Amino acid sequence: MNTDVAPVKSKTERKPKPKWLRVKLPTGKKYTELRNLVDKYDLHTICTSGSCPNMGECWSEGTATFMILGNVCTRSCGFCGVKTGRPETVDWDEPEKVARSIKLMQIKHAVVTSVDRDDLKDMGSIVWAETVKAIRRMNPETTLETLIPDFQGNERNIDRIIEVAPEVVSHNMETVKRLTREVRIQAKYDRSLAVLKYLKDNGIRRTKSGIMLGLGEQEEEVIQTLKDLREAGVDVVTIGQYLQPSKKHLPVKQFITPDQFQKYEKIGLELGFRHVESSALVRSSYKAQKHLN
């Protein structure tokens, strides 16, 4: 059993964040330039809308994350701050808009993600493919990571991603098997593993996944999830601290200590991952450009 955590005593208690979760405000010339561009042209990035703690660091390295297919999700995951409900009509101009944003911001490495669109027959996979194509046309030097939904495991939809060949394809497990139904009620642990394995088996050179800690998982469950990901051929894993977006979301059960994150990094590397990003403030796209190597 994992005891290297700082417990939160009750479901309703919201304790102050430990010192290792406090971050400095982003600064620097490159960050300021990009911040001004985003504000001037009303560019939409997850970095800003999600108030990512790593925004300044990533932008300074020329990396940013964009969300497509609207901002309303058909799923209601207990950890996620994205709105849920009836999504907007598909904007077929969105691929060009995202590509232009990347060009304006002079992004070297772009991460693209999306809400789940279970309301669409193709689950959004056509817009996904068109977005990658548009980015390639307008930004031929920019490398790409696509952080995709599970597309309900539909291989034809996953094939559309494979056909446009992003440098990295990521799909997040989010949590351990025991907690999957509670944390990702419309998702399935084994289906997510199958998606990752299918990507690797069908030509994606670099696959990636991420998990959050602090939802009540035990150390042995985290290690088993890492083993499952390696068995599926995953190359890169990110491990970070879950933070409750609002009182309506799942509570934080534990604040994981820096020493425990370092332990998981060591275990992950021993299991054979090419890269393991493991610390409290790590998010899916943290140090994303490094994962090309």
Swiss-Prot record:
Its EC number is 2.8.1.8. This is Lipoyl synthase. Keywords: 4Fe-4S, Cytoplasm, Iron, Iron-sulfur, Metal-binding, S-adenosyl-L-methionine, Transferase. PROSITE patterns: RADICAL_SAM. It is found in: Cytoplasm. Gene3D superfamilies: Aldolase class I (3.20.20.70). One of its GO terms (cellular component) is cytoplasm. The lineage of its organism: Bacteria, Pseudomonadati, Bacteroidota, Flavobacteriia, Flavobacteriales. PANTHER family: LIPOYL SYNTHASE, LIPOYL SYNTHASE, MITOCHONDRIAL. Binds 2 [4Fe-4S] clusters per subunit. One cluster is coordinated with 3 cysteines and an exchangeable S-adenosyl-L-methionine. It catalyses: [[Fe-S] cluster scaffold protein carrying a second [4Fe-4S](2+) cluster] + N(6)-octanoyl-L-lysyl-[protein] + 2 oxidized [2Fe-2S]-[ferredoxin] + 2 S-adenosyl-L-methionine + 4 H(+) = [[Fe-S] cluster scaffold protein] + N(6)-[(R)-dihydrolipoyl]-L-lysyl-[protein] + 4 Fe(3+) + 2 hydrogen sulfide + 2 5'-deoxyadenosine + 2 L-methionine + 2 reduced [2Fe-2S]-[ferredoxin]. Its cofactor is [4Fe-4S] cluster. [4Fe-4S] cluster 1 binds at C47, C52, C58, S285.
